[in-house]
Amino acid sequence: MAAGDGDVKLGTLGSGSESSNDGGSESPGDAGAAAEGGGWAAAALALLTGGGEMLLNVALVALVLLGAYRLWVRWGRRGLGAGAGAGEESPATSLPRMKKRDFSLEQLRQYDGSRNPRILLAVNGKVFDVTKGSKFYGPAGPYGIFAGRDASRGLATFCLDKDALRDEYDDLSDLNAVQMESVREWEMQFKEKYDYVGRLLKPGEEPSEYTDEEDTKDHNKQD
């Protein structure tokens, strides 16, 4: 037998059992391999379990964020329409109620809270006196961009940029059904919170003449 062959056989025996007489006994090498295999299996199981928990956590966070967004869309709009908060100080207390009249776009712009302490805005062709909400609709307010303007498009698209304002009369004809429904909802909310003082006139449209009786009747309805 060559020496090289003996070396190979010794190496083989060294990696097996110390004695082959027991037949069924497990060698240290086999035990180590089994332990190593079990370790990998445990690690893989832990990884899969951890990954499942991570996916579950991500899903829960996504659901919470979706719920918060829906609440913001639903109640945030109401908060915007409910501008006058309890205990809010505003110049409205010193201003008499405005007599009912109709406005052109140019006339409406005079009531932006800077040139005139009274603040008006239009929604869906209706003009509302929002002076008591000056904290919100005044020049320094978060929604001051709507003061003295037709706010319909901005409210329908929830856009507070100048892009939502039109210098000419806006017939809103390009808004879709959902956006127009939003405009009507805003109109109802402003009717509940603020004084309706007249209509926003279309180009060439003549203003209506309102009697004191009609004016008083409208104010009583709002009260």
Curated annotation (Swiss-Prot):
Record-annotated membrane-spanning stretches: 42-66
Gene designation per UniProt: PGRMC2
Tissue localization of expression: Expressed by endometrial glands and stroma (at protein level). Detected in urine (at protein level).
Q: What is this protein called?
A: Membrane-associated progesterone receptor component 2
- Sequence positions bearing Phosphotyrosine: Y210
Comment field on protein domains: The cytochrome b5 heme-binding domain lacks the conserved iron-binding His residues at positions 137 and 161.
Q: Name one GO biological process term.
A: adipose tissue development
Q: To which species is this protein native? A: Homo sapiens (Human)
Q: Other remarks on record? A: Non-classical progesterone receptors involved in extranuclear signaling are classified in 2 groups: the class II progestin and adipoQ receptor (PAQR) family (also called mPRs) (PAQR5, PAQR6, PAQR7, PAQR8 and PAQR9) and the b5-like heme/steroid-binding protein family (also called MAPRs) (PGRMC1, PGRMC2, NENF and CYB5D2).
